[in-house]
């Protein structure tokens, strides 16, 4: 298909079904690749628009797209959203009764469905039957990191998905994830037999604030959380806890204070968990206190904050969980509580896991993030392989910056030692070389003959540990945990070595008990007028009524962003209504007159006749 036709077709689909005028970075290029029959690995942050990358090709291409998803709740949310946009979609899973399944199969066979969502087990079992007898436009593997043992959420049922290529050699496969480091990405490509491009979007979420609070007793943490929620009146939020016991305790304490909170964990029945999730989606519960299982299956755009009551097990988990907040692009706050008790408990979990070495390394990096005095956003971006050369200016560390000094020579000494040792040493051996210590590893490999041996003996071991951690977090080298923790100099590190880039390191000092919390910077400084705020509330109430009538969560009817724009612009005609962000042709026809009528009604009441 000619490029110009593809561009026109996909732009029309984006406007008509989703109400967007422009694609986000990488979306259009990914869609074109899939429509040309090519495989893709897509890395985009949560809320970055991954689903559009396979949904638009599914609408444009003949046949049915098969979407593999790990959670039934995730499938259900996405199918409901597609239906609300006028797109023929269905889910095939254990929740279907025999009648539902028969109807869905018939719709597949007749070509009526554009997308069908399945679990990995269901896909494998149906390959000889349903999927061998229908025209498949593409396969989309969501949460693709689950296929890799190097990933943070390995799921054995995903490991069979490599057979897709054997049975459907000419059908494009698009694998998508929000969290995968370089090693995990390589493993995904290998396991799924992908032979196309890899697209990596920016992992930066500038609308999220990042804060860490160290230590604190149970009562101090609860007091802070209560004050925090009172500072976010009516805003939906999630509190992640390490144990079921803590989810119940935190929810109970908040309810005592009059906050509408609910606990969510694996100890609840399937029906109880589904009820909590549904009430949260429908804005009937403000706060969910949950173990890590919660949130993966939710596409709720107006979560305004996330608190981690305990330290997460990895940066991947942390990034994915804070990604539940601010999916609509508006400012959102994230706070992480951190204590050594969490580290000890998580270490015991890692020791007992089947991937001890990998999990211990990931926990170590998470602990380093929590203890860091380097810009937190910079740490996250560098961890995921995205070069970040400047501090963000609005995390808690940047808001209260520590004292720094010119550390260029120190960094050059350390990186020179790494290079001269063939990039095969781990951090401990690097320190031995710099300090001039004849450790067994140094003697065995003749590292004491290197020019850099003893070049850093004027600094203590603990000083070098701190400086090397800063260098790692600033992205001057990376740790290859699949090569026994070998240090590898990055392109940014080479620039420092060549004298092309100066470096400021944090001056060592006693650790403070706590870094103050900052709030999300506002994406827009424009304050809504009182009249706009009043109209927004009226429109939000109308949206809730429409959602309840249809059994949808309110955000599926219209997003908060669309409501804010409606309250600000006050469209007078159906054409103007259809130009609002997030309102496609289907929603324009379905809801236009209803919302316009409410806007006119409010205008009359305020004396603004038109």
Predicted features and spans:
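C-terminal accessory regions
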Residues: 362-387, 535, 541, 548-550
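Short helix-to-turn junction characteristic of helix-turn-helix DNA-binding domains
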Residues: 34, 229, 280, 370, ...
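Accessory DNA-binding and partner-docking regions appended to nucleic-acid-acting proteins
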Residues: 2-10, 358-360, 389-610
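Helicase motor core with emphasis on the C-terminal RecA-like subdomain
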Residues: 2-17, 21-25, 29-51, 58-61, ...
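Flexible coil/turn residues that form the inter-helical turn or adjacent wing/linker of helix-turn-helix
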Residues: 169, 233, 373, 423, ...
């Amino acid at each position: 298909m000619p490029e110009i036709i593809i561009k026109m077709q996909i732009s029309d689909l984006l406007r008509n079904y989703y109400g967007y005028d422009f694609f986000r970075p990488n979306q259009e290029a990914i869609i074109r690749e899939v429509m040309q029959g090519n495989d893709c690995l897509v890395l985009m942050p949560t809320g970055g628009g991954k689903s559009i990358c396979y949904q638009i090709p599914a609408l444009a291409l003949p046949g049915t797209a098969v979407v593999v998803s790990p959670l039934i709740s995730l499938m259900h949310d996405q199918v409901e959203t597609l239906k609300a946009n006028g797109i023929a979609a269905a889910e095939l899973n254990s929740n279907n009764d025999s009648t539902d399944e028969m109807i869905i199969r018939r719709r597949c066979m007749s070509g009526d469905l554009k997308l069908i969502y399945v679990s990995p087990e269901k896909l494998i079992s149906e390959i000889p039957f349903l999927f061998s007898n229908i025209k498949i436009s593409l396969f989309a593997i969501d949460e693709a990191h689950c296929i890799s043992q190097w990933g943070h959420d390995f799921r054995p049922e995903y490991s069979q998905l490599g057979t897709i290529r054997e049975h459907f050699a000419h059908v494009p496969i698009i694998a998508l994830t929000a969290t995968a480091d370089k090693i995990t990405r390589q493993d995904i490509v290998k396991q799924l037999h992908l032979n196309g491009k890899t697209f990596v979007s920016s992992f930066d979420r500038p609308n999220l604030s990042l804060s860490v609070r160290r230590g604190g007793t149970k009562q101090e943490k609860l007091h802070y959380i209560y004050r925090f929620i009172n500072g976010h009146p009516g805003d939906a939020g999630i509190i992640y806890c390490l144990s079921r016991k803590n989810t119940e305790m935190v929810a109970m304490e908040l309810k005592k204070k009059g906050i509408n909170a609910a606990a969510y964990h694996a100890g609840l029945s399937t029906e109880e968990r589904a009820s909590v999730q549904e009430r949260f989606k429908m804005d009937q519960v403000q706060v969910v206190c949950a173990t890590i299982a919660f949130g993966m299956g939710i596409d709720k755009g107006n979560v305004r904050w996330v608190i981690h009551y305990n330290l997460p097990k990895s940066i991947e988990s942390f990034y994915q969980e804070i990604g539940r907040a601010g999916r609509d692009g508006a400012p959102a706050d994230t706070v992480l509580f951190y204590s050594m008790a969490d580290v000890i408990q998580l270490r015991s979990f890692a020791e007992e896991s089947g991937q001890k070495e990998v999990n211990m390394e990931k926990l170590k990096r998470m602990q380093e993030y929590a203890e860091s005095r380097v810009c937190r956003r910079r740490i996250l971006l560098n961890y995921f392989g995205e070069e970040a050369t400047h501090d963000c200016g609005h995390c808690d560390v940047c808001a209260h910056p520590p004292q720094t000094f010119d550390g260029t020579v120190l960094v050059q000494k350390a990186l020179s030692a790494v290079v001269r040792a063939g990039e095969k040493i781990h951090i401990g051996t690097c320190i031995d070389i710099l300090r001039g210590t004849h450790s067994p590893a140094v003697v065995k490999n003749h590292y004491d003959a290197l020019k850099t041996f003893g070049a850093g003996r004027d600094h203590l071991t603990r000083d070098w540990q701190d400086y090397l951690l800063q260098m790692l977090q600033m992205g001057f080298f990376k740790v290859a945990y699949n090569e026994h923790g070998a240090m590898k100099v990055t392109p940014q590190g080479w620039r420092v070595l060549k004298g092309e880039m100066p470096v400021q390191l944090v001056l060592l000092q006693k650790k403070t008990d706590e870094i103050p919390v900052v709030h999300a910077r506002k994406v827009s400084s424009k304050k809504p007028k009182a009249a706009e705020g009043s109209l927004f509330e009226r429109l939000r109430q109308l949206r809730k009524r429409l959602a309840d009538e249809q059994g949808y969560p309110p955000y599926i009817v219209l997003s908060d962003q669309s409501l804010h724009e409606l309250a600000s612009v006050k469209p007078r005609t159906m054409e103007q209504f259809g130009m609002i962000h997030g309102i496609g042709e289907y929603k324009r026809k379905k809801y236009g007159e209803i919302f316009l009528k409410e806007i006119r009604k409010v205008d009359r009441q305020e004396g603004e006749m038109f």
